[in-house]
Amino acid sequence: ARGQKISKACAACHSFDKGGANGVGPNLWGIVGKAKQGQSGYNYSGALIAHGNPKWEYIDLNEYLYKPKKYAPGTNMNFIGLKKPEDRAAIVAYLRSLSDSPVPLPTDAQIAAEEAKLAPPETEGEGEENSEETSNSDTTDTETSE
């Protein structure tokens, strides 16, 4: 599948086999729904503990794979990220398949909300009725029209 093909770049640091050894990065078998620093025998940086949500939910994997160092400042993962949503979705789907009991898939609404959150900010005005000029910093992450 596409996700498995894309994940070959990850194999330099991660293993994907059930019971597989950790490498430079932790083994990723069963990662979806697992505690963020839950791979025994791997020395994590601590950046993921500081992030909040204790488990690797779909939304967290999507954000982390988009920009790992933005999601978890101080992470040891030296990967710039995957810009294309379809690449992230393929990897996450592949990771989901690496389980004896895969986590249920997200709903279409959850997917749409996450894509809107990660979309680049709009650079032009939103056509607000406010007569005063507002700066781009006044817009929220959810204001997109792409």
Model-assigned labels for residue ranges:
Residues 1-7:
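Electrostatic cytochrome c docking/interface patches
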Residues 6, 28, 36, 77, ...:
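Short, flexible micro-motifs
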Residues 9-12:
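Short, cysteine/histidine-rich loop/knuckle motifs that typically chelate Zn2+
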Residues 14-20, 33-34:
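Detector for the c-type heme attachment site
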Residues 22-27:
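Short cysteine/histidine-rich zinc-coordinating motifs and their immediately flanking basic loops
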Residues 31, 35-38, 68-72:
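A short secondary-structure junction motif
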Residues 42-59, 63-66, 70-146:
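Flexible coil segments in periplasmic/lumen-exposed cytochrome c-class electron-transfer proteins
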